[in-house]
Amino acid sequence: MSRTFALTYDYRCPFGRIMHDHVVTGLRAGADWDVTFLPFCLGQTHVEDGMPDVWDAPASDTGIDALQFSVSLRDMQPDVFLDFHYRLYEHRHTAGGSLRDRRILTNFISEAGGDAAAATDDVESGRPLKVIKSEHTSFAETHGVWGVPTFVVGDAAVFVRLMKPAFGDAALAVSTIDRILDYVEWPEMNEFKHTRIPN
């Protein structure tokens, strides 16, 4: 039976990159997961009182363009999304690349086999930004989501950090995510954290 969950992402988060590396690796290997990728704008969580929300002043945020293009692909070109999603995390965290350069974003779409012009038109329409606002706000209110990466399973939402990516090991990726999902379904354990980072 397919395991259904949602997972927040923002390309600026290094722990998001590690978690999504496991998820993408597992999905590419055929893991029986039904995953909803939820955009969660970390910039919005740092907006000071009296300042406009990111969706009202998107030019002020360093990660919102990347989120908008990813949401466009997720919704309108889903066959392209996973490759773009993985490439963008690697671009940011292994190459230190920019998330604001639209030439880079659209090149990644084209390289993944997508229609970059259609994605750009979608972003320019404002639709993806509205979706980000809606999903970010909704899950913050209904599930108390506050960060990346957070798993959402039914009524439960759990923030989880992994220390190492899967490095292409599909068996490791699948077993890791399945273990996390097992823990999500065990609410009696609320916190489990090493006092020192293991070697």
Positions of PLM-derived features:
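Structural alpha/beta surface segment adjacent to cysteine/selenocysteine redox centers
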Residues: 8, 17-102, 179-183, 187, ...
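Short beta->alpha junction loops/turns
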Residues: 12, 77, 125-128
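Short, surface-exposed alpha-helical recognition segments that flank or form part
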Residues: 14, 57, 123
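The canonical Cys-X-X-Cys-His
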Residues: 13-16, 151
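N-terminal entry module detector
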Residues: 1-11
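C-terminal cap of thioredoxin/glutaredoxin-like
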Residues: 3, 20-28, 102-199
